[in-house]
Design a protein with these regions (language model features):
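Short coil/turn segments at alpha/beta junctions that flank glycine-rich nucleotide-binding fingerprints
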Residues: 25-29, 81, 102, 140
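Helix-turn-helix
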Residues: 14, 22, 26-57, 61
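Short, hydrophobic secondary-structure boundary micro-motifs
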Residues: 107-110, 146, 198-200
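Amphipathic alpha-helical segments used for helix-helix packing
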Residues: 87, 96-118, 164-167
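Hydrophobic alpha-helical connector segments
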Residues: 75-104, 151-155, 180
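C-terminal peripheral helix-coil segments that are non-catalytic and often amphipathic
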Residues: 2, 97, 128-139, 158, ...
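Amphipathic alpha-helical packing segments from all-alpha helical-bundle domains
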Residues: 68-75, 116-140, 149-153, 164, ...
Length: 200
């Protein structure tokens, strides 16, 4: 029983990895079961259907795997940052660094978000996470007063746009680091308290 369970889990992981790589290469719309099966070296699409109820089920597994990979890369850096401002900066900078470390995962997630974001509560939850982060920072007196939803939307859309460009052009790590600093500077300044101590 343990051997069969291990084999089944291994096969699922193999299919998910292949699906992520196919989505990164040809896009979500063209990522058919036949393409994924061929990429995974499977004899038929029936192997995929055995492990997943359909494309939506496979997509959910792909998003979960990508989020695990990205979380393992980014979260320790964010947790090590001291305070709301530093965490904001680290989130942005590590997002750009992620492009260099896991390009296929980033490209796949971008395409999934663009085509099927409604199917991933975790992806959609980014907005709520940033809203809460900004509220907490305002309550702590480190962010100026602003509409947290508007700024969260601006952050996510702006960051995603830069990440999309970086994922397409595959710049060197030093360039990714520069892009991360530039974008982080922009958002830190946009949310910072007025130099005179009042609100902007």
């Amino acid at each position: 029983m343990q051997a069969r369970t291990f084999t089944g889990s291994g096969r699922r992981a193999q299919i998910v990895t292949a699906a992520i790589e196919v989505i990164a290469e040809v896009g979500y719309a063209k990522a058919s079961f036949s393409r994924i099966a061929k990429h995974a070296g499977l004899s038929s699409t029936g192997m995929i259907s055995y492990h997943f109820a359909g494309k939506d089920d496979l997509l959910t597994a792909c998003v979960a795997e990508i989020e695990q990979v990205t979380g393992a890369f980014m979260q320790p850096r964010i947790d090590a940052a001291d305070g709301h401002v530093a965490q904001l900066r680290t989130y942005v900078e590590s997002n750009l660094a992620l492009v260099g470390e896991h390009p296929a995962a980033v490209r796949a997630l971008i395409d999934i978000v663009k085509n099927a974001a409604s199917q991933s509560p975790a992806v959609n939850g980014r907005l709520a996470v940033f809203e809460e982060h900004f509220r907490a920072g305002q309550a702590a007196g480190v962010f100026r007063p602003f509409d947290v939803r508007t700024v969260a939307i601006a952050l996510i859309t702006g960051l995603d746009a830069v990440v999309v460009t970086a994922a397409d052009t595959a710049p060197e790590p030093t360039e990714l680091a520069r892009l991360g600093r530039e974008l982080a500077d922009l958002y830190v300044r946009a949310t910072a308290l007025d130099p005179e101590g009042g609100s902007a």
